[in-house]
Structures are given as C-alpha cells and as structure tokens.
Regions:
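Long, intrinsically disordered low-complexity tandem-repeat regions enriched in serine/threonine/proline
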Residues: 9, 14, 26, 31-94
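Peripheral membrane interaction modules
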Residues: 2-21, 35, 76-161, 165, ...
Length: 427
C-alpha cells in the first residue's frame, strides 16, 4: 500500500519534468504562426502601398474630368436661355470654343505682322481708315497730270450676304463689327460695314444683307486687295455676346466681271460679291433730293435708291465707228428703306447709306429711285443716266411718277499712291 502510494507520488513528481518540454513545443508553433501572420500582414501592406498611388492617380484624373465637364455644363447653363447650345455634346462645345480661339489668334498674328511692317512705312495704326477723298481731283481744272491722277481697274463692292447660319445661331441676329478692304494706295482700312455694339444691324430671313456704308473711295485692284472681317452677335449682356467670324482674305483677279469671295466657319457662311471694272474713274453721289412732291406720290416716305454703270465698246458697223453699250454692271444699293419712313427734317434730301461707285471712263452712271408701299411693294420708279467725266460735277432732274427729283454727282480720277500726292511740289 505504501509502495503504491510512493509510486503514484513518483509519477506525480515526474510529471513536472515533462510539462516544460510539452510547453516548449506549443510556444514554438505559436511563434511560427505569428511569424507567418506578420509576413502576410507586411505583404498586404506592401500591396496596399503599391496600389495606393495608382488609385490616387485615377481619382485625380476622375476629378479633373469631372471639373472639365462641370465647367462645360456651367457654360451650357449660362447660355441655355438663348437655346444656343441645347443638344450639343461637350466635344462639340469644346471644338467650337477652340475654333473661335484659333480664329482670334490668327487675326491677332495678322495684325501684329501688319503693324511691324506697315507702321514704320507711315500707314499709322492698324484701325486707321483711309483719309483720301473720293473727290480728290474733282475741283482741279484743267485735267490733272496722269502721273498723279489715273484711270485704272477697280473693285466695285456689290453686296455682303449672310448666306448661312450654323452652330445654334438663329435669325434674326443683331450683328456688329467691321468689314474693310485695304489696297496699295495707302494700305489703310476702307470701311465697307461698320456697326457698333450699341447700334447693331438686325439681320432677318427676308433680308440677309449687311447694310454697307462704303467704300469711301474707289478700291484700286492693280495689286491684291485684302479684306478683313470681324463680326459678333449682340445677345443682351456683354458677357453673353458671341463671336460670329474673324478672318482675312487676299483677292486678285485679272478678268473683269462679277466674283464671289466666301468666308466660312462653324457658325456662318458669308459671301462678298464684287465686280472688277477696267479703266474707271470714281463717282460720288453727293445728293438725291426731292425738288417737288407729287400729288399722287410722296418719295420721301418709303423708297429705295440704287445705281448701276454701263460701259461702251467701239465697233465698226456698216463701215462706220459706232459705240455700243455693253451689259450693265451689277446693282449697287445706296439706300434701302422699303418699309421704313424717312426721318423728318431732311429737307427733301434722301439719307444715302453709301455714295461712292466706280464708273468706266467712257461709260455712264444710272441712278434709280423706287417708291414703295407700307408692305414693301414697289409702286413707282424713275431713273436718270449721267455720262462719266474726269472731274467736275453733273446735275440732272428726273421724275418718279409726278414727283420731281434732282441728283448731283462729283467726278474724280483715281489716286495711284498716297505718297505721290503728299510729295512736295518743286517750284
């Protein structure tokens, strides 16, 4: 019995010797597990660190894209009231913006080039207009020397038409800006169209023509003629105005006749119609005056004034030299008030919007006056023809129904070069 107790006691005493050994095995396994967990944790952190920059870059790109889209949508919201950009994609809006910016930059480069070249030559500033008068030689008698005054080929400006509207614009449009020509006489602007923002021209479907105010003198076309066009659309607030077109174009043609010069971009197409005339002088329609009103017709209420030129060719008919009239030139509109009454206090003088035309030196000038009803229908017409002169004045009377009118025209040869007439005369 005692022996058994001692044996059991011995077993109990031996057990503690084995427990530490068993405890060491358990601690080693736990250590290995902890190492594996730490390693996996480190690998996971490395992977996260690697992926983090890529995620941040993607988020930055998304933010930038979102910002651009928000800016475009903001711009679209600003013009939504005018229905300008409804239905346009972000890409279309971006392309339109880039094209207008490119047009304006091209025009700015052209202007800087002109200023660097022409400024030192005495042409003064870019926006300066020609100061040469269309009546420069009108008062000189006898006929001036042909060294300073010439008969030469010129460009007749017939019309400027807004033939197409695109890019969300809709008629009617309030257009302002400048269309001008430059020739070799002085290289200054010869204004054809000029309207300020506070007094734009309303362009309508039934009358898409710009109301011309020039040229102020004949346009010489011995060398290329440069046309400049800068037009904008007035849309209420200044910040809402839109650029319509900015462009320049050189034009030169040897053959006489009517020619069309096109300007086109994403927003419009404009056609400038010109006619090249040979051996011309310049005529200034000084006045068209109502001398006596008729009982049936009052010319000043609503009327239209236009002119055309006719040249003559010398031909031998039946053995005799005979002058035969050629086909008349294109029509030049001097005043168009078909539906608007003339302002009061004009004392019978019709307020012409343009006055200078080119006439072939052996030709004639035909002036036509039409009176119209309130609906714009022509109800009466009268005309008068005047033979061209090298200098001086011509004056004739004619009738429109039972009203009597009088036209006065000044004639002048052309200036070939501004420097020639400014040169001191030797005594």
């Amino acid at each position: 019995m005692d022996f058994e107790m001692e044996e059991e006691s011995g077993k109990q005493q031996q057990l503690p010797r084995f427990l530490p050994h068993g405890s060491d095995i358990h601690s080693s396994d736990q250590h290995m597990i902890d190492l594996k967990v730490d390693k996996q944790k480190q690998m996971t952190e490395v992977e996260i660190d690697k992926q983090k920059p890529m995620t941040e870059v993607k988020m930055d790109k998304q933010k930038q894209t979102t910002k651009v889209e928000m800016d475009i949508r903001k711009q679209m919201a600003e013009v939504e009231m005018d229905d300008m950009d409804i239905g346009k994609s972000v890409q279309e809006l971006t392309m339109e913006k880039e094209e207008i910016a490119a047009e304006e930059e091209d025009f700015s480069c052209y202007r800087r080039a002109w200023e660097s070249r022409r400024g030192p030559e005495g042409c003064s500033f870019f926006e300066d207009t020609t100061q040469l008068s269309s009546m420069h030689f009108t008062h000189l008698t006898p006929k001036p020397s042909l060294d300073d005054a010439i008969v030469a080929e010129t460009l007749q400006i017939l019309s400027i038409k807004l033939t197409e509207i695109k890019g969300g614009f809709k008629l009617p449009l309030s257009v302002y800006g400048v269309v001008a020509a430059r020739d070799s006489v002085d290289n200054n602007r010869n204004l054809l169209f000029a309207h300020s923002r506070i007094a734009p021209q309303r362009i309508r479907q039934h009358n898409p023509y710009l109301r011309l105010i020039g040229p102020s003198r004949a346009i010489l076309c011995r060398d290329p003629v440069r046309f400049e066009i800068q037009l904008k659309v007035e849309r209420g607030a200044v910040s809402r105005d839109r650029a319509l077109i900015s462009a320049t174009r050189d034009f030169y043609v040897r053959h006489p006749g009517v020619h069309t010069i096109c300007f086109e971009n994403r927003f419009c197409k404009i056609e400038l119609c010109v006619e090249r005339l040979v051996e011309t002088i310049q005529a200034t329609i000084c006045s068209v005056r109502v001398v006596k009103q008729g009982t049936r017709q009052r010319v000043e209420s609503r009327c239209r004034v236009s002119c055309s030129t006719t040249s003559y060719s010398r031909k031998i008919i039946d053995g005799k030299p005979t002058y035969v009239a050629n086909a008349p030139s294109g029509e030049v509109v001097l005043l168009d008030r078909l539906k608007k009454p003339m302002p009061s206090g004009s004392e019978g003088y019709l307020d012409l919007s343009r006055r200078v035309v080119s006439v072939e030196h052996e030709g004639s000038l035909k002036v036509v006056v039409q009176t119209c009803s309130s609906s714009g229908d022509i109800i009466a017409e009268g005309h008068v023809s005047l033979a061209s002169e090298y200098f001086g004045f011509s004056q004739k009377r004619f009738n429109v129904d039972d009203a009597e009118l009088e036209v006065t025209v000044a004639w002048s040869l052309l200036v070939v070069d501004k420097d020639d007439i400014l040169r001191p005369v030797a005594v």
